[in-house]
């Protein structure tokens, strides 16, 4: 199962069809285990996109919650959260991700968690800045005078007005998540075989560039 249709099983092996060249039967050929490369590319795209979506969903949600509270209320909590985000940003992203993965282990869930943690600070800063800008706007002051509760002000009156800015950062984050997941899987610390990922497929195929170049070119 996945986001895209696959004509063959992505894990079924066939010694008789090992390194079959591209044909009408196998559009992108087969790999060293006789698996259909087209099916695995489709599955790899599905895996990478799904992981990237969940990374952005997790980090974006946490970024909204932390950024909204710290940006609106300020104070000690704001200071603590900002110092934590500064500390996270102080480490190279790939290094911090490697540390988290080394503690948690490889696998889809841990990749999502590791990348999600690394991506949170960027969303916190964007949301915090927008909430700080809007918390003293005239319409927010009028809402307070009318007795509107803080939670409603945060998530009904302010949050919808930052989505134009937040959406742009989400798109950038999604692209970065795709690159990060592919890089991690290529290095062998992301999605584990036999699950297909664009990164681990490229890593497996590079050794056959001379004998079966379609494995890499696909």
What are these regions (language model features)?
Residues 27, 31, 62, 71-72, ...:
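Generic hydrophobic transmembrane alpha-helix motif, especially the helices
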Residues 1-33, 187-196:
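Hydrophobic alpha-helical transmembrane segments of membrane transport/permease proteins
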Residues 68, 97-102, 111, 115, ...:
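Transmembrane alpha-helix boundary and packing residues in multipass membrane permease domains
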Residues 38-46, 50, 78-89, 105, ...:
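Alpha-helical membrane-interface segments at transmembrane helix boundaries
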Residues 37-72:
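Transmembrane alpha-helix signature in integral membrane proteins
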Residues 101-103, 130-131, 179-218:
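Glycine-rich helix-loop "coupling/hinge" segments at transmembrane-helix boundaries
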Residues 38-52, 102-122, 214-218:
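Loop-to-helix entry region at the N-terminal start of transmembrane alpha-helices
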């Amino acid at each position: 199962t996945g986001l895209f249709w696959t004509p063959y099983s992505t894990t079924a092996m066939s010694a008789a069809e090992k390194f079959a060249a591209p044909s009408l039967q196998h559009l992108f050929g087969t790999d060293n285990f006789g698996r259909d490369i087209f099916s695995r590319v489709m599955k790899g795209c599905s895996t990478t996109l799904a992981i990237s979506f969940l990374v952005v969903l997790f980090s974006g949600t946490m970024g909204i919650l932390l950024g909204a509270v710290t940006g609106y209320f300020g104070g000690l909590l704001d200071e603590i959260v900002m110092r934590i985000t500064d500390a996270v940003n102080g480490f190279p992203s790939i290094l911090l991700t490697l540390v988290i993965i080394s503690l948690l282990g490889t696998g889809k869930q841990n990749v999502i968690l590791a990348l999600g943690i690394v991506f949170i600070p960027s969303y916190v800063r964007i949301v915090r800045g927008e909430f700080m800008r809007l918390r003293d706007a005239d319409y927010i002051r009028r809402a307070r005078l009318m007795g509107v509760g803080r939670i409603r002000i945060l998530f009904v009156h302010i949050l919808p007005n930052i989505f134009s800015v937040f959406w742009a950062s989400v798109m950038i984050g999604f692209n970065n998540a795709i690159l990060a997941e592919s890089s991690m899987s290529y290095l062998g610390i992301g999605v584990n075989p036999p699950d297909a990922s664009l990164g681990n497929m490229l890593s497996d195929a590079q050794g056959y560039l001379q004998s079966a170049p379609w494995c890499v070119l696909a």
